Amino acid sequence: MKQSYANMRNFWLDIKNLENRKGIIEIGPDRIAVAGIEMALADGTVTKHLFLATNSLGDSSLYFENNSKSGLGGTIGGHGNEALQTAAAHMLAHASKLTACMQCEPAGTMLPAPSNPGWVRLFAVSNEKLFHAEFEETQLRDPQHPFYPFFAYSQQTLGFFRTQGAHTSSAQS
């Protein structure tokens, strides 16, 4: 994992970064304020990662490892994009309902990256705890899987980021 990617990932996983922000809402029985996914993807013989996170303020970010000098690509979104904000809010809401089905660690614990390409780690963060679960992406695409809504909303959010990026690229052309 490239350091620039790890830095952005760790920023989102450290709930202390939200301490001085007004309007944070803690959701569900475990009072989460951040949720997201991390995917491992094969790029030839190298594994690269994609990280999507949102918080209860409506902020969302997408980061991914790439071949640039910094090794990091990404975009920040949510504000001004109602569809993205709605999908991200649904992802956060579904994550809050699944914390009892996830592994639980003390807040500040290092979140393990997905085990292998094709695997997805879903996570939720509260002031006291880091919740996470890992599944093969093919499992999460099954509508009967308990984490399907969480994953499906993450994929919608990713799609809105892609659309946002495409609009930005065409506007700059």
Show where each model-derived region lies.
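Short, well-ordered, aromatic-rich surface patches in folded extracellular/luminal domains
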Residues: M1-M39, P114-S173
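A glycine-rich, hydrophobic loop/mini-helix early in the fold
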Residues: R31-I37, D43-S68
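Surface-exposed, interaction-prone regions used to assemble/regulate multi-protein complexes
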Residues: A95-L98, T109, L122-A124
